[in-house]
Amino acid sequence: MSGEPELIELRELAPAGRAGKGRTRLERANALRIARGTACNPTRQLVPGRGHRFQPAGPATHTWCDLCGDFIWGVVRKGLQCARLSADCKFTCHYRCRALVCLDCCGPRDLGWEPAVERDTNVDEPVEWETPDLSQAEIEQKIKEYNAQINSNLFMSLNKDGSYTGFIKVQLKLVRPVSVPSSKKPPSLQDARRGPGRGTSVRRRTSFYLPKDAVKHLHVLSRTRAREVIEALLRKFLVVDDPRKFALFERAERHGQVYLRKLLDDEQPLRLRLLAGPSDKALSFVLKENDSGEVNWDAFSMPELHNFLRILQREEEEHLRQILQKYSYCRQKIQEALHACPLG
């Protein structure tokens, strides 16, 4: 991406609250591979996706379906994921959604990955992720030092109420596809500039892969939280996937190694930016899939939690039925062998 950076403005945002109610189940899903700068033939909606090699997802897979957008959860049947070795697809979906996947498996992509470690291997120089609390005078001094180091007009500004505003840059490194509202004309990144925002109820959706070099600058408040940054990015790209499918990471280069850390929902990216300074090597932000395997059950609504309990009970009953059937079959074969043996 070239030219002047496009900015996303985040001002006064709604206070943190419980996640919204679960979306209605998808009636019909359309999936298209959107190639940047090229038109797509709408008739491809009827063509099954090619190249995928779906396998059962791992036991730690707790994520959202790339087709219908619903949460994938279970103890035994967690879902399917594309495991094609020569591709970087990772398309993940429910078992029930497999037949509806129309998005072709993406070929090998240079995503610019670098080896990352989550903890320092040098015990003499531990990585400190804690951030100190600054006084108002220290914040003012930090802002002056920050503005003196940058070579652009993306300054930080101190407000009268003690808060401050500034800019953060987020790089999107998404392996899996994202979903946008389906329309007569397939969406593009340029369409995001004209969109009003994410809809609350989307029953038809189109999936595509975002370019690997997508970068966005956001103008945020010091109290803007990581979760709000994710939601703003999704609105800008018209993405209707659940924000909990994604996570914001901080990336740092130290001693020739790259360190990644997942930000908590309530962490304040601009505060981290101020403490680290303007250097991208000292700190940069990356949006990735939230594939840590951890589930924050408190973030789900009551209807969603009750639905998960029903799924768990149904899966437990099915698993018990299969076990009983297996042992019953084995017992029957042993009894048949006993009856076939001659007496004495």
Curated annotation (Swiss-Prot):
Residues 294-341 form the SARAH domain. The gene is RASSF1. Gene3D superfamilies: 1.20.5.110, 3.30.60.20, Phosphatidylinositol 3-kinase Catalytic Subunit, Chain A, domain 1. It comes from Homo sapiens. Coiled coil: none annotated. This is Ras association domain-containing protein 1. One of its GO terms (biological process) is regulation of cell cycle. Potential tumor suppressor. Required for death receptor-dependent apoptosis. Mediates activation of STK3/MST2 and STK4/MST1 during Fas-induced apoptosis by preventing their dephosphorylation. When associated with MOAP1, promotes BAX conformational change and translocation to mitochondrial membranes in response to TNF and TNFSF10 stimulation. Isoform A interacts with CDC20, an activator of the anaphase-promoting complex, APC, resulting in the inhibition of APC activity and mitotic progression. Residues 179-203 are annotated as: Disordered. The modification Omega-N-methylarginine is found at R36. The lineage of its organism: Eukaryota, Metazoa, Chordata, Craniata, Vertebrata. Keywords: Acetylation, Cell cycle, Cytoplasm, Cytoskeleton, Metal-binding, Methylation, Microtubule, Nucleus, Phosphoprotein, Tumor suppressor, Zinc, Zinc-finger. A zinc finger (Phorbol-ester/DAG-type) spans 51-105. It comes from the Eukaryota. Isoform A and isoform C are ubiquitously expressed in all tissues tested, however isoform A is absent in many corresponding cancer cell lines. Isoform B is mainly expressed in hematopoietic cells. Residues 198-292 form the Ras-associating domain.
